Amino acid sequence: MEKIQIFGARVHNLKNIDVEIPRNSLTVITGLSGSGKSSLAFDTIFAEGQRRYIETFSAYARNFLGGMERPDVDKITGLSPVISIEQKTTNKNPRSTVGTTTEIYDYMRLLFARAGKAYSYATGEPMVKYTEEKVIEMIQSDYAGKKILILAPLVKSRKGHYRELFESMRRKGYLHVRIDGEVQELTPGMKVDRYKNHDIEVVIDRLAVKSPLALSSPSSPDDRLKKSVQIAMKQGEGLIMIMDHETGAVKHFSRRLMCPTTGISYGDPAPNTFSFNSPQGACPRCKGLGYINEIDLDKVIPNRKHSIHDGGIVPLGKYKNQMIFWQISSILAGYECDIKTPINEIPEEALNEILYGTLEPVRIDKELVHTSSDYFVDYDGVIKYLRSVMDDDDSTPTSRRGPSLGSEKWAEQFLAECQCPECQGQRLNREALSYKIWDKNIAELANMDLDELREWLNEVEKHLDKQQQQIAAEILKELRTRLDFLLDVGLNYLSLNRQSASLSGGESQRIRLATQIGSQLVNVLYILDEPSIGLHQRDNERLIHSLKELRDLGNTVIVVEHDRDMMLSADYIVDIGPRAGRKGGEVVFQGTPTELLKTDTLTARYLNGSVRCDSVAAKKTTTDQHLVLTGCRGNNLKGITAEFPLGKLIVVTGVSGSGKSTLINETLYPILSKHFYRSLQAPLPYDSIEGLKYIDKVVNVDQSPIGRTPRSNPATYTGVFSDIRSLFVNLPEAQIRGYKPGRFSFNVKGGRCETCGGNGYKTIEMNFLPNIQVPCEECHGKRYNRETLEVRFKGKSIADVLDMTINQACEFFENVPDILRKIKTIQDVGLGYIKLGQPSTTLSGGESQRIKLAAELSKKDTGNTFYILDEPTTGLHFEDIRILMEVLRRLVDRGNTVLVIEHNLDVIRQADHIIDMGPEGGRGGGTILSTGTPEEVANSDKGYTPRYLKEELERQ
């Protein structure tokens, strides 16, 4: 069958549509936000493919997999096995990294286990190992004619009294042991200091080594020497020590890898030796995380202008008549201060005593505690008190403890992640880090940018010996292949050690895409959700090449996408529209890109240039007010100074990984958030910031959900639901019945339907079949009880209002200004098609972001707000971008500053000011290449953005 055919698709807003998609093609499904693209691609095609796959399992297995409802579609034919690659960052496990997700790190572990060279972590010398025969040969050579002691190591630098060990050795017939370098006779009941570290060896034999000439055959060893070495090897579990009787000098030998100087030995390396998720390889201090949690003094004392009396030390709170405040008062009295002195005026020495405790007991003045005489109390310090809460240290005597500071969870607010001091953030123990290939250990390779790692893999074979080359050849080939797939999808700036939780949705999706290309599957249907998210135009070309490569393997690739280049490179396009929500859900075009350009659909008009995403003209005025951030050096930033002109639309551009998010989301925003709201999020390192006096608040409008449960919706988020409930409560019928605003909430008892708890549906457990949700038989999905629904405004109940689209609600409330003002802003950001009570869990990231923008637009404006948006065009059609730009321009026209991180050229060319970063991603980025108007940046000769921007400006 040459086509995938969908007949009668009616999922969500799809209007009984029929669609044909050619097999073994790259097909783009496009259309306005909310038009039904995802409903067709994911909720129809993917859902049906998944359902058919799961139906092949037994009922017992299906119970564990969860249910897959049949999508509302008449028939789908020609469907292959389906794999969905969505843009969700689902893995929040700190142990998951780019390396573990792609399995590249697994191959790296195998490479080091098979071809790594071991070095001593103590001396840096190459580790050695010996056979019994080699040990005997070296003894005969080095100690010929000398008296020696043959020792078997039993304990290496460990505490304990070892009474049982000594008794066991005595029962085996041994007469002497060597304890901490001193040979002693084994005696009954012998033991050592249990609180000190000890080195213990048992003396296996004392003998004079015969010269090879004195033996009957120079090539055959002395029988006694041979037997003693064998016993020592067995007793010492592969380790043996030879001590010169005359000088006391000791040499170490081992069947295992061993440092010839110190005797430190390693077990044979295995892949788990290099795994930070295994006890064998993980750093013992941080357990393989690379960081530990330490108390952050900036969180304990966030504002040093406050006094201790007024709560300057946050864990203590404001002054209370308690022992700890008496102790602190006593300490401060010795420095001629008191607890009402601002903390920044307290001498450093006094503050250290308050935080970390005193060496001597603190004298408590009798007048403070109303006793007949002064008395002395031990004082451990605020930090010790906090640690006792976190460690739940029940061994700490009650009299020595601080005040009741709450639970461990409460204490966690004063913690900050910091690099593990033992492994320096490398996650592995010192043994694993001591294996090297071409002077690099596995952690150093995992921290390289992927393109740097690829260069290393290209060159490493020249630096291996013949045996290593033979062992490593296949592993290196697999590593290069998998790495190339990641580079092809524009992820060259990442490292294998990058945590999965820190990746954007687009990065996670492209990693999964690279993994799928690497799997070399054929006859599969892949469905991707906007893979171009977060990609610069330069990287986008490589992504398109990768998708075509996936197609050329013999697969069908369906991409939900708005990117111009992606659409024009596709084999086939399905355009869903004509508008969004109830006005969408139809196929307005299906065919080739060439055929699309000849039509008059909204998408075609934008593609052929007859319509553009222009908002009103950019501001040409100059401003004296700037926010200046200097010395930014977090992640890959190279001590840069960034200048942000206020009252303008600023766009930060640059290739993926160039440092945009580091500069804005991890440096600038935390600084502003800490300044205005005392946020505890610490910014990355910087020197100074100037110009804060010109702004009065910061708002980060991101794409995170507006709520985590179906009970949250646009009405509750924007606050308009409170106004609607107030309207209903003031209606005559509600007044007669004595209803309060809570009566019209589906979250509290009173007005909601108690049968379903205000959900509108009930979940039915099906035992060995998937659970199903059915409309509540009492309220029929309306969420409220009958009495509440009897109160009506213009013939509509509260449930009817929540079921209206934003467009319908604007007409309905046209004479209620307070409600209309808030709803109108949602309509203004292009979301007229969503329902007022639509569950937040069903909204896309782009829709959530625009609802947040609408909420900001509805607020009273000071004109000095600093807005930050990270890739707001995600999930947006050209028409949606036009509407978004009008909204952003409105904010700027009020005097606010809007800063956008963006790759979309339709946004970049409309900026008042551009900051272009690069030139490359990762270590090759971190600098500001050019700044200015779009025309000024387009004329720059630095980086990649100017070339693409110039082409875009010439197209106008």
What is each of the regions a protein language model found here?
Residues M1-Q956:
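Conserved phosphate-binding elements of NTP-dependent enzyme cores
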